[in-house]
Amino acid sequence: MKVFILACLVALALAREKDAFTVSSETGSISSEESVEHINEKLQKVKLMGQVQSEDVLQNKFHSGIQSEPQAIPYAQTISCSPIPQNIQPIAQPPVVPTVGPIISPELESFLKAKATVLPKHKQMPFLNSETVLRLFNSQIPSLDLANLHLPQSPAQLQAQIVQAFPQTPAVVSSQPQLSHPQSKSQYLVQQLAPLFQQGMPVQDLLQYLDLLLNPTLQFLATQQLHSTSV
């Protein structure tokens, strides 16, 4: 529509220019040249205006076509998800087997109980030095003359005197079968420590005496320390 209106305007302008051209041609040749140049300028302006209008029309058509096309929205479709039924049974899991520790024999358990009663857990084992060993053996050997300790004696003689001075329990013959090693050892420790409990021996000395009974190497070291102090 706009192009048609522009074409009509151009036609009217040309008609007017032609009328003016005919009038001016009658007036003179000089004015005719100026009118021709003026007409050419107007024609160029009209052509430029027509081009601008045509470009505007094309742009409007292009934008209207873009807006009319539906825009594609990604993931516009709804995702169907079926609900989980309530009657599904849980997956069967393997039964958990409790871990079983090492099997402890009743003889070893009785020995550990006897040791736990003699050795309290909250007390730390004292360090065995020469003075403690001397005091321990002096309290257990009343028949040993301390004045004669300066005399040189062999380790075997000194150990024999110490063993004789300790209280010995008589061997009881029974018709029962022979006990296993852990049970016989625990009974031996209880028999050795029972008289010391009755005599009111200090707990520290009892613990050191128990170490001497459990570790024969400590007995040999104790005899060596006694021999060195006597020399």
UniProtKB/Swiss-Prot annotation:
Protein name listed in UniProt: Beta-casein
Keywords: Milk protein, Phosphoprotein, Secreted, Signal
Highest taxon above the source species: Eukaryota
Post-translational modification Phosphothreonine, affected residues: 27
Pfam families the UniProt entry points to: Casein
The keyword Magnesium is assigned to this record: no
GO cellular component, one term: extracellular space
Leader peptide range in chain numbering: 1-15
Matches recorded under InterPro entries: Casein, Casein_beta, Casein_CS
Keyword Transferase among UniProt keywords: no
Cysteine disulfide links: none
Function summary: Important role in determination of the surface properties of the casein micelles.
Molecular function via GO: cysteine-type endopeptidase inhibitor activity
Similarity-based family: Belongs to the beta-casein family.
Tissue: Mammary gland specific. Secreted in milk.
